[in-house]
Amino acid sequence: GLARAARLGITSVHNMDGDEAQVLRYLALHEAGEMTLRVYVPYSVTPATPLAELQEAAAWRTRFHTSHVRAGAIKLFMDGVLESYTALMVEPYADAPGNCGSALFSTEHFAAIAVEADRLGLQIFVHACGDGAVRRTLDGYAHARRVNGQRDSRHRVEHIEVIHPDDMARFARLGVIASMQPLHAPLTRHSAEVWPARAGQARWPLSFAWQTLRQAGAHLALGSDWPVVTMNPLAGFHAALNREPWRDDDPVQRQTLAQTIAGYTHDAAYAEFQEHEKGQLRTGMLADMVLLSEDIFATPVADIARVHPLLTICHGRIVFAE
């Protein structure tokens, strides 16, 4: 995994495993001088996790804090995915009347977790694909802010495959980060299998709504969700830059090259409170960088996936050279 990431020019990841054994493996690799990237690992929380266990998640913040291995967040699954009707929807699935999917956490249960995690200063990551799951997550974040007061929490919603228009402005208002994955969105409705039918045409305008969220003031961070899709950032670039509206009157959600670069670099660093440390090539920033085979500003967007790294540097050390 590390060697593949280095070949693909990746110098930082957010590993959603949330497993202590995994973090300890990263630490051992770091102490042996073999870590080729930086990793931020949230603590996994399930419906069976006692509220008191969040103290252990908070302890991870100081227990795992090196140049290459960091913690300080929790990760939950609010729902599943649209393909299997397990994503929580506000209205029923277009091709399954009466079925709104399901959630792993009740409104009250998640609100209690959000309040306690926020009180402990933890960042919260929540997998939410359906618009109902996105809403329930935002409701929990809003409740935590009311109880604990406002702070720079940068809680996150992961995926946001569908969003209800009433919830669009809440990301900016609550300071919540939209963590999204360009490769999840079908480039056209014809390149998908069941997803467009599950959502239905009424929800297409706000499906994978990258640009609409940006216009509403949300901070976006872009990533892969590997191993669900390839971890190759340039494949993600291709998806972000070449996406077409599914209907002529749907909003254009494709990203500009500048937005895409920022989403994978500076904005992703912002999503882990590291924007002053990495994510830009500037004096005083960490020496994490990649040399590409072509000038991506001169490469046609249709051909962007052919670009590949020639050199990857992490922490000032060459970790890959072609």
Regions found by a protein language model. Name each.
Residues 19-135, 139, 147, 170-183, ...:
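Metal-coordinating catalytic core of metallo-dependent amide/deamination hydrolases
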Residues 3, 11-12:
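Short acidic/polar active-site loop segments enriched in Thr and Asp
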Residues 62-63, 300-304:
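Short proline/glycine-enriched turn/loop segments at secondary-structure junctions
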Residues 115-125, 129-155, 160, 165, ...:
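His/Asp/Glu-enriched, well-ordered alpha-helical/loop segment
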Residues 106, 299-300:
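Residues that cap or delimit alpha-helices
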Residues 11, 37-38, 69, 151-155, ...:
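Residue-level recognition of the N-termini of beta-strands and the immediately preceding loop/turn
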